[in-house]
Design a protein with these regions (language model features):
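Transmembrane beta-barrel wall of Gram-negative outer-membrane proteins
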Residues: 197-226, 236-283, 304-306, 386, ...
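Outer-membrane beta-barrel translocator/receptor signature
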Residues: 130-134, 146-150, 155, 160-233, ...
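Acidic, small-polar-rich N-terminal luminal/periplasmic segments of exported/outer-membrane proteins
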Residues: 36-181, 555
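Membrane-embedded beta-barrel scaffold of Gram-negative outer-membrane proteins
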Residues: 227, 313-314, 322-341, 503, ...
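C-terminal beta-signal and adjacent terminal beta-strands/loops
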Residues: 126, 518, 574-576, 676-680, ...
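Outer-membrane beta-barrel domain signature, strongest for Gram-negative TonB-dependent receptors
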Residues: 244-402, 565-567
């Protein structure tokens, strides 16, 4: 038993200090906790997301990386873009004008195609209304980073286990439990202070936990006050040429509560409550070239999210199941924005584009709300038939989401003294899609079969999904949609998967998987509509949208030596009926909205393909010293149009040199870079194409004793001026846009955090 465990230990490849079965049996392991990217280490790490059950990372036939609480504290990120900055296959575009980090992009797939969960509960949808006014956006609201004990990222389609919305991958956040604070004591806690010069933000965290073997509790609270994220711009004017950031005041606060009840050795209950809210005030001093009559503007955003869940776990001593887990949950999220504009020398109707002699004040409001109710049930069973070991899981997921959106506006013409609720042909309030309900039900099963004394693993899986979209009758949408009523929609889909892993030697694992993916069209894509008759454009609903479907083939290899660990993966993802918003040929297309020059609509694209390769590795060349690195390459095409996919980033890489003592002291120098942007779809307009870059960060950390730890960092050490392609394309920056330095990344900044444990 011990010899077999040692062989499996040599084949492990990931980064985080999770002590598992082999460690418990006395197997030696190298303790290493990287400060930067999720690198590879000789620990028998356990992951959950890839199989929905605890599994050794080296036994997973997919690409998955993790970060733990210590790595997050040392990296000191302020948003998801910072959290995943050293992962070259992950991109988190920021709206540098106002809203910040929005949605996660994995291997060129983003937005609501990447499933994000906190403690098994899906985060709210990402919504972006677009347009030059930039007033209607709602992010997915990642959890408070100081509450996290772990983050797992699974690449590629995961619909066979998680259903719709996981067609591009899964990001799973796990929050801390009482035991993470008590550390074996009856009572424990932590206090934290952090400051980051990237946005002059100062944060405070506090947590306490305690209890007995039967009952345990935890409560944590966090608060942060910050300002605008820095860049390398110098023009401080209130104009279209401004390059310095728009001034911001940002406040966020959060709290987390947990109660764990071990009613008996076999029965455990878990109650969780999480709250987050934030407010941002922005002086929108950089003006839009598309809105020449807007001469001053400011914005305010409020967001809130509340989640409550009750979990149950049953582990019988014997019986039909080894484990039964269930969770019921409710989550409510809301984003509201208010934008105030001064429009000068404008028309009597206060147009943003038409010249006139009027002076106007325009107030524009936006609200997006989701209420989510659901449950999941999963059973696990291990057994043997002949010489084959089986690990069977199966279960059901159900989720009901009620979504609503609205826009409002008040227009005051200061020259004529009139006030109206009409602007640019729209009569407020208005809905861009009807309020309604989406239901998703999924049944899944997977059998992990081990042959030849565990050296070969074959895992078939299958999931059945049914979804239904039920809009309310909504006159506020009907008029915008050209008199086309909102439609209900439902569909069912099977998502199979087959993966294989072969332990070729004690040091080499080879794996492959063939996975089917699936995503149902959402409320905005099916029933969304918009009209701007003054400027002559709009968006039409599409009741005929089909679900997206994908087929993904991925192969990989992992090698683990005494001082070298490395892995490589090759993937080819093909998407059919990919949903994308396109401009219609008007007026010949029957879907065109009457009276408008241009109509946009979500359409199914016949074929989209993304393929690429990734490499990760670590080399411990001396005691306490190691080098790690990662490279990601992807190539994407819309095969219907022959155009590149703008969501695919150029080749990117990261590397680091780390010195670390087991006592908790260490330092790292990290580099990350990208090739120049050359492949873009410029059919609508010509994008500004960022040059390649390479930046260096320094990190240091010191654990003085079991109670006090300090982390310091210098980001962009050499004050490099550079742009990220994700930020550029998210905003739609053209090659002729003035003041592109507005979209540059921060220069040299400093950060520090102090943590007290008791």
């Amino acid at each position: 038993m011990k010899r077999r465990c040692l062989a499996r230990l040599r084949a492990s490849v990931r980064v985080t200090p999770v002590a598992a079965v082999c460690a418990a049996l006395g197997s030696p392991a190298l303790a290493a906790d990287g400060a930067g990217t999720a690198t590879l280490v000789a620990l028998n790490e356990v992951v959950v997301t890839a199989t929905r059950t605890e599994e050794r990372a080296d036994a997973v036939a997919s690409t998955i990386t993790t970060r733990d609480a210590r790595q997050i504290q040392r990296a000191q990120p302020v948003d998801e873009a910072g959290l995943f900055a050293d992962e070259p296959d992950i991109d988190v575009p920021r709206d540098r004008r106002r809203f910040g980090a929005g949605s996660i992009n994995i291997r060129g797939i983003e937005d609501n195609r990447v499933l994000q969960m906190v403690d098994g509960v899906r985060l709210p949808d990402f919504f972006n209304g677009g347009g030059p006014s930039n007033i209607s956006s709602s992010t997915r609201d990642a959890p408070e980073f100081s509450f996290l004990k772990r983050v797992e990222v699974l690449r590629g389609p995961a619909s066979s286990l998680y259903g719709s919305d996981a067609i591009g991958g899964v990001v799973a956040y796990a929050t801390k439990d009482p035991s993470d604070l008590t550390q074996g004591r009856k009572v424990g806690g932590e206090l934290g202070l952090n400051w980051n010069g990237i946005d002059n933000g100062f944060g405070q965290t506090a947590g306490v936990a305690g209890g007995s073997d039967t009952l345990q509790g935890l409560f944590m609270v966090a608060n942060r006050n910050a300002h605008e994220m820095k860049n390398m711009g110098s023009d401080d004017s209130n104009s279209v040429s401004r390059t310095r950031p728009n001034p911001q005041d940002v406040r966020t606060q959060a709290w987390l509560g947990k109660i764990l009840l071990n009613a008996s050795p076999a029965h455990k209950f878990r109650f969780t409550y999480e709250h987050r809210d934030g407010n941002t005030d922005t002086d929108l001093l950089r003006l839009s070239t598309a809105l020449p009559r807007v001469t001053a503007a400011n914005g305010n955003e409020d967001l809130s999210r509340d989640r409550v869940s009750l979990g149950y776990e049953w582990k019988p001593a014997s019986g039909v199941l080894d484990r039964l887990a269930a969770q019921v949950y409710y989550q409510e999220s809301e984003t509201t924005t208010l934008t105030s504009q001064v429009r000068s020398n404008t028309s009597t109707g206060c147009s943003a584009t038409t010249r006139g002699s009027s002076l106007c004040n325009v107030s524009l409001g936006f609200a997006f709300k989701q209420e989510q109710t659901g449950f999941n049930l999963q059973g696990d069973k291990s057994f043997a038939t002949g010489g084959v070991e089986h690990r069977l899981i199966g279960g059901v997921d159900f989720m009901r989401v009620r979504s609503s959106e609205s826009r409002d506006g008040t227009v005051r013409n200061l020259t004529t003294g009139t006030t109206t609720k009409s602007l640019a042909g729209e009569n407020f309030p208005i809905h861009d899609f009807p309020t309604g309900e989406t239901r998703q039900t999924g049944l899944f099963a997977q059998d992990e079969m081990r042959f030849f004394d565990g050296r070969f693993t074959l895992t078939p899986g299958l999931r059945f999904d049914h979804y239904s979209l039920s809009p309310d009758g909504d006159d506020l949408v009907y008029n915008n949609a050209g008199g086309r009523p909102a439609v209900s929609k439902s569909d069912s889909h099977l998502s199979p998967k087959l993966s294989a892993l072969w332990q070729a030697t004690d040091r080499v694992n080879l794996w492959a998987q063939y996975v089917f993916g699936y995503r149902a069209p959402n409320y905005q894509e099916v029933n969304g509509s918009f009209r701007n008759p003054v400027q002559g454009y709009g968006a039409a609903p599409n009741a005929a949208l089909d679900p997206e479907k994908s087929r993904s083939f991925e192969i990989g290899a992992r090698y683990t030596g005494d001082n070298v660990q490395t892995s490589v993966a090759l993937f080819d993802n093909r998407y059919r009926d990919f949903i994308e918003q396109v401009q219609l040929t008007c007026p010949s297309d029957p879907a065109c909205l009457p009276g408008l020059r241009a109509t946009y609509q979500y359409r199914n694209q016949a074929s989209v393909r993304i393929y690429g390769a990734e490499w990760r590795g670590v080399w411990r060349f001396l005691p306490q010293w190691r080098i790690d690195g990662a490279v990601a390459y992807a190539h994407g095409n819309n095969e219907q149009t022959g155009q590149p996919l703008n969501s695919v980033s150029p080749l990117r890489a990261s590397a680091g040199l780390t010195w670390e003592r087991v006592q908790g002291q260490g330092a790292a120098i990290r580099w990350r870079g990208a090739r120049p942007v050359t492949r873009t779809d410029d059919s609508s307009f010509t994008y500004f194409k960022p040059a390649g870059y390479g930046v260096v960060d320094l990190q240091a950390w010191w654990r003085f004793n079991r109670y006090v730890s300090l982390a310091l960092s210098v980001n962009n050490l050499f004050d490099k001026k550079y742009w990220l392609w994700g930020d550029v394309r998210q905003t739609g920056v053209s090659a002729t846009e003035p003041g592109v330095d507005f979209y540059t990344q921060p220069g040299r900044t400093f950060a520090a955090s102090l943590k007290l444990s008791f």
